[in-house]
Amino acid sequence: MMLEYVLGLSAYLFSIGIYGLITSRNMVRALMCLELILNAVNLNFVTFSDFFDSRQLKGNILSIFVISIAAAEAAIGPAIVSSIYRNRKSIRINQLNLLNK
């Protein structure tokens, strides 16, 4: 019974992240929504790893790998956003065309 609740929470987080990623015009908000999506995926990895075979740690190891990738994205993403803001004076996604200049 606990599996359904965790999967429902994960689906809810994933849906919020996808909705925010599709509708956001701000790059910082898009990065935050991407983090929500990655956290929902991590929750699924850990849940299914524990539910199907709690002796093996494959889901947990994969989750740690995704967390490290998300940490790198969280470090590099704002640096790219600040660089774009310095050059273009805007971080709105629909106003950026990096191939123009």
Swiss-Prot record:
UniProt topology in membrane: Multi-pass membrane protein
Keyword annotations from UniProtKB, A to Z: Chloroplast, Membrane, NAD, NADP, Plastid, Plastoquinone, Quinone, Thylakoid, Translocase, Transmembrane, Transmembrane helix, Transport
InterPro entries tied to this protein: NADH_UbQ_OxRdtase_chain4L/K, NUOK/Mnh_C1-like
GO molecular function term, any single one: quinone binding
GO biological process: ATP synthesis coupled electron transport; photosynthesis, light reaction
Reactions performed catalytically: a plastoquinone + NADH + (n+1) H(+)(in) = a plastoquinol + NAD(+) + n H(+)(out); a plastoquinone + NADPH + (n+1) H(+)(in) = a plastoquinol + NADP(+) + n H(+)(out)
Class in the EC hierarchy, top level: translocase
Membrane-crossing residue ranges in chain numbering: 2-22, 32-52, 61-81
EC numbers for this chain: 7.1.1.-
Cellular-component GO terms for this entry: chloroplast thylakoid membrane; NADH dehydrogenase complex
Location in or out of the cell: Plastid, Chloroplast thylakoid membrane
HAMAP family according to UniProt: NDH1_NuoK
Subunit structure, as described in the record: NDH is composed of at least 16 different subunits, 5 of which are encoded in the nucleus.
Free-text function comment from the UniProt entry: NDH shuttles electrons from NAD(P)H:plastoquinone, via FMN and iron-sulfur (Fe-S) centers, to quinones in the photosynthetic chain and possibly in a chloroplast respiratory chain. The immediate electron acceptor for the enzyme in this species is believed to be plastoquinone. Couples the redox reaction to proton translocation, and thus conserves the redox energy in a proton gradient.
NCBIfam families in UniProt: PRK05715.1-2, PRK05715.1-4
Similarity field: Belongs to the complex I subunit 4L family.
PANTHER family per the UniProt record, alphabetical: NADH-UBIQUINONE OXIDOREDUCTASE CHAIN 4L, NADH-UBIQUINONE OXIDOREDUCTASE SUBUNIT ND4L
Protein name: NAD(P)H-quinone oxidoreductase subunit 4L, chloroplastic
Organism taxonomic ancestry: Eukaryota, Viridiplantae, Streptophyta, Embryophyta, Tracheophyta
